[in-house]
């Protein structure tokens, strides 16, 4: 990606160098369930059980439940690579602010910017305590997205998803959940899922996740239009990321077969489809994941 001269967002809390207390009620954000499965797979554990446990603890919505604990200082110097990745993340967040502010204004709405929290290990949130083990996540309780930047290393080593635009896709997806919150979609889905059995709740979760993928594509469309940010190979990076985090892809890799009723983020084909649809159209009205039949997803 070409980010030369791009501003960095000021809506960032840098909690790196601080560590939370005991772990409690971990929830999964985008890729979090899949990372849990990948870690289990590469360590000889049961990936499907690990993924389902993470999903059940979280509800598949990228929010956290748990008990807040003390936070302690653990200062250290960060490497040049770590600092560059932090800078990159704040530039991507700034890009989402610019794009979504304009889109909301076009629809006579006001975009309330989220805050991005950078942390290491564990941190407190309004939704409970978050853990780096479960990847990036969005907490609607405080309208913040939480990222331990070491997750991007995990993406590369465990899932084979690498490249700056792949990382940007992850951030834009979490911002997509914030857009869902601001428009009331997330709350409505939460309420409905609470009354559903697990299989139906999984299906609802898939629609939320695919919509966030679509919104990530919409952001990329307009960010490139505004700033000329995309370079050769960038789109392929994001498409590859969407493919390797598909529920079916990871389950087949881990177990040799997939269990469709357990899918809660969408198949590789679905995730690539909705990201590409957002990228190609840039039109938020095309994000009709809650209006499609299951076969149309």
Functional labels for PLM-detected ranges:
Residues 1-77:
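Long amphipathic alpha-helical segments used for membrane anchoring, targeting, substrate engagement
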Residues 38, 100, 147, 165, ...:
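Active-site recognition of the HExxH zinc-binding catalytic motif
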Residues 50-128:
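A metal-dependent hydrolase signature that marks the N-terminal structural subdomain at the beginning
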Residues 83, 87-111, 200-203, 207-250:
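Short helix/loop segments within enzyme catalytic domains
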Residues 122-148:
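Catalytic zinc-binding patch centered on the HExxH motif and its immediate surroundings
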Residues 151-170, 200-206:
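Short pre-active-site segment immediately N-terminal to the catalytic Zn-binding motif
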Residues 175-190, 223-224:
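Catalytic Zn2+-binding segment of zinc metalloproteases
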Residues 243-297:
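Pan-zinc metallopeptidase signature
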């Amino acid at each position: 990606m070409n980010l030369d001269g791009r501003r960095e967002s000021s809506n960032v809390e840098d909690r790196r160098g601080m560590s939370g207390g005991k772990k409690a009620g971990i929830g999964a954000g985008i890729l979090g369930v899949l990372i849990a499965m990948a870690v289990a797979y590469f360590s000889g554990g049961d990936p499907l059980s690990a993924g389902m446990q993470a999903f059940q603890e979280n509800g598949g919505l990228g929010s956290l439940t748990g008990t807040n604990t003390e936070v302690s200082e653990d200062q250290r110097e960060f490497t040049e690579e770590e600092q560059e990745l932090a800078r990159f993340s704040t530039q991507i967040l700034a890009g989402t602010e610019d794009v979504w502010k304009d889109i909301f204004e076009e629809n006579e709405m006001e975009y309330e910017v989220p805050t991005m929290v950078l942390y290491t290990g564990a941190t407190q949130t309004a939704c409970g305590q978050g853990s780096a083990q479960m990847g990036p996540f969005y907490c609607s309780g405080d309208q913040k997205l939480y990222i331990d930047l070491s997750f991007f290393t995990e993406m590369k080593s465990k899932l084979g998803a690498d490249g700056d635009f792949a990382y940007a896709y992850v951030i834009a997806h979490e911002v997509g959940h914030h857009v869902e919150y601001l428009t009331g979609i997330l709350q409505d889905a939460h309420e409905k899922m609470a009354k559903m059995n697990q299989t139906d709740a999984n299906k609802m979760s898939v629609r939320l996740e695919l919509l966030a993928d679509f919104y990530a594509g919409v952001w990329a469309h307009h960010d490139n239009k505004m700033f000329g940010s995309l370079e050769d190979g960038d789109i392929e990076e994001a498409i590859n990321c969407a493919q390797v985090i598909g529920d079916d892809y990871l389950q087949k890799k881990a177990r040799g077969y997939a269990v469709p009723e357990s899918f809660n983020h969408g198949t590789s084909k679905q995730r690539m489809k909705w990201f590409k649809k957002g990228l190609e159209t840039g039109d938020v009205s095309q994000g009709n994941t809650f209006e499609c039949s299951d076969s149309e997803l």
